[in-house]
């Protein structure tokens, strides 16, 4: 559970959680529309560039901003398999499946400043966009929320102040 990766307020020990958003210019989506192969290449490259920007930002946070890994020196293979401390789950992925989190992150980060807009369902535009959270906890590992039971969905919706049906839409549960 993501909340296990942050110290409780009652501990009296400060802790930090990061929020991030990254995207590639929306104009990239219109390139080579008449050539499906080149268009697919541009889309794929755009997705990878958005992820790479996020990876670089996460490295900066680990080494400089939060400084908990100042001496980190990973080889490219180790970097690619994420042999560093901390995780950065992205919204919509198994560790953070609730698409409505995008609206909270948008309120916090004002993502339109970098060109990201949200649909009514919380999907991001341009498609080559990613946002999520950063955790520095030494034991943090990616996990999958898994199948959400009806009782869990009802409890989560109640705690989020939303209807069960609304949360079902955002969780695709």
Segments from the language model and where they lie:
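Electropositive phosphate-/nucleotide-binding environments in soluble metabolic enzymes
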Residues: 43, 47, 51, 150, ...
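Compositionally biased, low-complexity/repeat regions
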Residues: 8, 59-158, 164-165, 169-172
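ATP-dependent carboxylate/acyl-activation modules
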Residues: 10-70
């Amino acid at each position: 559970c993501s909340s296990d990766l942050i110290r409780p307020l009652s501990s009296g020990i400060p802790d930090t959680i990061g929020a991030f958003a990254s995207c590639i210019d929306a104009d990239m989506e219109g390139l080579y529309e008449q050539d499906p192969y080149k268009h697919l290449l541009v889309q794929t490259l755009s997705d990878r560039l958005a992820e790479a920007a996020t990876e670089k930002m996460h490295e900066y946070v680990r080494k400089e901003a939060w400084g908990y890994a100042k001496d980190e020196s990973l080889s490219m293979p180790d970097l690619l398999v994420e042999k560093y401390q901390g995780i950065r789950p992205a919204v919509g992925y198994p560790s953070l499946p609730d698409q409505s989190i995008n609206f909270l992150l948008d309120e916090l980060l004002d993502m339109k400043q970098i060109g990201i807009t949200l649909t009514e369902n919380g999907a991001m535009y341009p498609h080559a966009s990613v946002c999520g959270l950063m955790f520095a906890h030494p034991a943090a590992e990616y996990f999958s929320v898994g199948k959400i039971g009806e009782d869990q969905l009802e409890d989560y919706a109640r705690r989020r102040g939303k209807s069960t049906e609304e949360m079902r839409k955002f969780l695709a549960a």
